[in-house]
Design a protein with these regions (language model features):
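Short, hydrophobic/proline-enriched secondary-structure or compact coil segments at domain edges
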Residues: 1-8, 63, 214
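Signature for HUH/AEP ssDNA processing cores
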Residues: 42-50, 54-69
Length: 256
């Protein structure tokens, strides 16, 4: 099991698993100075009470479950190689694939399963997407490797492809939409997500301006869309939008 730990959770682990042999994933990596902020690999036996506890209440265990017949050192080497990935040329970033929420987006968009799983035979997790969470939907997910030849860990960084990048960007967008949806209980999650997509398409692509755009749209929900906004400074463009929303009758009124 690979999960993020705090002191109470670590105590529970030792109560359920006498010899979990925790291994810090960030150790011996370029993230080594942040070991305590990273996840830990916990070794389980098939009849482990911890495994049973995870299956019964997965939301209490923030991580993913791995099945592998390979040595622990080999598994750790691969998991560590997945921590920092490359994308869009020379850009790189930390990949929190061990977060069930992130896993639900990333691995659903992963085609090169053998490359990403390496010595992992099967990956399990229980985590909704943000859209699922807005509807109180959650279920088990899994990813299985069809290969028995796992080979050595990747020599260079793993590279995110376009589908994976798009999935992770969608995860970030939906996370922001979910946060705003919790603040606006009168609105539907998909309504807020749709507004945000329109806002980004209109050039409001940073958190502050997108938040202001969203507030304006939620104030006038009768408008499903708006005309193209003239170019200029962000505040000027927001004022243009606000003026149009205030002055334009609702569609039903204009047709009456």
């Amino acid at each position: 099991m690979l999960l993020e730990l705090d002191e109470p959770l670590l105590q529970r682990i030792y109560q359920l698993e006498p010899d979990p042999r925790p291994e810090a994933l960030f150790a011996d990596t370029e993230l080594g100075t942040h070991v305590e902020q990273g996840p830990w690999l916990i070794q389980l036996t098939p009849d482990s009470p911890l495994l049973s506890a995870y299956r019964q209440a997965p939301e209490q265990w923030p991580g993913v479950l791995l099945s592998s017949g390979r040595p622990v050192d080999e598994l750790l080497a691969h998991l560590r190689a997945m921590l920092v990935v490359q994308f869009e040329g020379e850009r790189k970033g930390i990949l929190r694939y061990y977060d069930p929420q992130v896993a639900s987006y990333l691995f659903a968009a992963t085609e090169a399963v053998i490359t990403w799983l390496g010595p992992i035979e099967q990956l399990f997790w229980h985590g909704p997407t943000w859209a699922d969470r807005s509807e109180n939907i959650s279920h088990w997910r899994s990813l299985r490797s069809e290969s028995t030849n796992h080979g050595a860990p990747p020599k260079g960084r793993l590279i995110l492809d376009r589908m994976q990048i798009a999935a992770l960007e969608q995860q970030q967008l939906e996370a922001f939409a979910y946060e705003r949806w919790q603040e606006h209980s009168h609105a539907e999650f998909n309504q807020i997500l749709g507004y945000m997509q329109q806002g980004i398409a209109s050039g409001f692509d940073d958190e502050k301006s997108l938040g202001a755009y969203l507030e304006a749209r939620l104030t006038y929900p009768q408008h499903l869309s708006h005309p193209q906004i003239a170019s200029g400074q962000v505040q000027f463009r927001l004022q243009q939008l606000q003026s149009w929303l205030e002055a334009t009758p609702a569609p039903s009124e204009s047709q009456g």
